[in-house]
Amino acid sequence: LGLRACDGNVDHAAVHIANRREELDQIKKEEREKKKRRLENINHLKGMGYSMRAARQALHQAAGNLEEALKILLHNPQLWWLNDSAPESNNRQQSPSQEKIDQLVYMGFDAVAAKAALRVFRDNVQLAAQTLVHNGGRLPPDLQLSAEDSSSTPSTSPSDSAGTSSASTDEDMETEAVNEILEDIPEHEEDYLDSTLEDEEIIIAEYLSYVENIKSAAKKN
């Protein structure tokens, strides 16, 4: 490639190759730093009470910008339902503990709103409080409906609801898996030249394993 780029001139090709290696090394260094920042941002959001899936999705939509990801999470509370191991529909059916309801009431929130928020956010006081503060002490309309649905008896059987949602759930899981794997693949146009067949096999195996693990977790629940 170096000789081709330099019309067969060996000396120029050697300089060209050395320069390209320096450029690629710099690009790889920047990509490592980018991945490190992304992991730090994910951990920062997890420390605020968000699940890893919610943090990753928000950061993906915000192109890695932490402040924008926080805005996305605040304005799209449905993302907070994303759980790392189980479908959110099962988790939202749990009744909140009285102790955590009392904590929110002590902060000044209405008991009914506190209970509804805790039901939606699986007893997570921090997320429930953030939602209530952001919406003037109440749940937004879409979350109010979700809280009511989770506390009432469904009119359809579990098998019926599972049948109608399984296809879209599988598609969402596969899309998320693809996005996760793609974010770990170097972005530079010539990086594939440094990849071996073993590297490609590892990436494919990781993708297939990721999809299989998510599907297995969904089936268990």
Swiss-Prot record:
Note whether Secreted occurs among the keywords: no
Q: Which InterPro entries match?
A: NUB1, UBA, UBA-like_sf
Compositionally skewed regions (Low complexity) per UniProt: 146-168
Tell me which GO cellular component terms the UniProt record holds: nucleus
PROSITE patterns hit by this protein: UBA
UniProt subcellular location: Nucleus
Give the keywords, sorted: Nucleus, Repeat
Q: Where is this region: Disordered?
A: 136-193
User: Is Nucleus among the key words of this record?
Assistant: yes
Please state the protein's primary subcellular location. nucleus
> Acidic residues compositional bias: what residue ranges?
169-193
**Residue ranges occupied by any UBA domain in the UniProt entry:** 1-19, 30-76, 95-135
> What are the GO BP annotations of this UniProt entry?
positive regulation of proteasomal ubiquitin-dependent protein catabolic process; protein ubiquitination; ubiquitin-dependent protein catabolic process
The task this protein performs is described as: Specific down-regulator of the NEDD8 conjugation system. Recruits NEDD8 and its conjugates to the proteasome for degradation.
- Subunit architecture: Directly interacts with NEDD8 and PSMD4/S5a, a member of the regulatory subunit of the 26S proteasome. Interacts with AIPL1.
Official protein name in the record: NEDD8 ultimate buster 1
Q: Which organism is it from?
A: Bos taurus (Bovine)
Its lineage opens with:
Eukaryota, Metazoa, Chordata, Craniata, Vertebrata
